[in-house]
Amino acid sequence: MKIKALLSTLALLSMAASSTAMAVEKGDWLIRAGYTSVNPKGNNHPVVSVDSAASLGLNFSYFFTNNLTVEVLAAYPFEHDIRLAGGGEKVASTKHLPPTVSVQYHFMPNNAFKPYVGAGVNYTTFFSTKTYGALEGTDLKLGDSWGLAGEIGADIMLGEKWLLNFSARYIDIETKAKLNGDSLGDVKIDTWVYTVAAGIKF
């Protein structure tokens, strides 16, 4: 449902932007910044679950042809609460950074509405992990993660330089958890990431 709603919004905005169609071409840069929401899947682990989080997202795209770009995703750290499975007591919190490098294909570089798809590689690092409640005083560690990422999105030009951006991406994040040095197994945080941003072309 979220993807359908996003696509409907993009279609409506594309009609509104049709009078300001601006091309992008080889050698152009796009810089975007805006609201980014990270939404882990519900069944992360048999014992614990990871809540959603939001932060400032940044991304940088370079057009090495008129259609193909390399994008680097960055962000201010996301902070997640970790609860007992089923939405129970908060037992920990952690921060993470999910830098992602993707190759994107932009379908209509000469139009104001520029949809694209992309695929790439994600590296996620966890830090500032704290414990509470039933786990207070214990040492919880979450290992770093490598995984694949895929995305869909669109840029909507508002003039020669300024643009709006909407995107949804899926990131494969899986961390190994340890409590006081003992393994708790893998925590699958495979997540949807939604972004609404403003950007500039140069």
Where are these predicted regions, by residue range?
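Transmembrane beta-strand segments of Gram-negative outer membrane beta-barrel proteins
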Residues: 25-39, 191
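Gram-negative (and chloroplast) outer-membrane scaffold detector with strong preference
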Residues: 25-28, 59-133, 145, 194-202
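Cleavable N-terminal export/targeting peptides
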Residues: 1-27
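A charged, solvent-exposed segment within the mature domains of Sec-exported extracytoplasmic proteins
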Residues: 116, 126-172
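Predominantly the C-terminal beta-signal and adjacent terminal strand-loop region
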Residues: 79-84, 93-95, 159-202
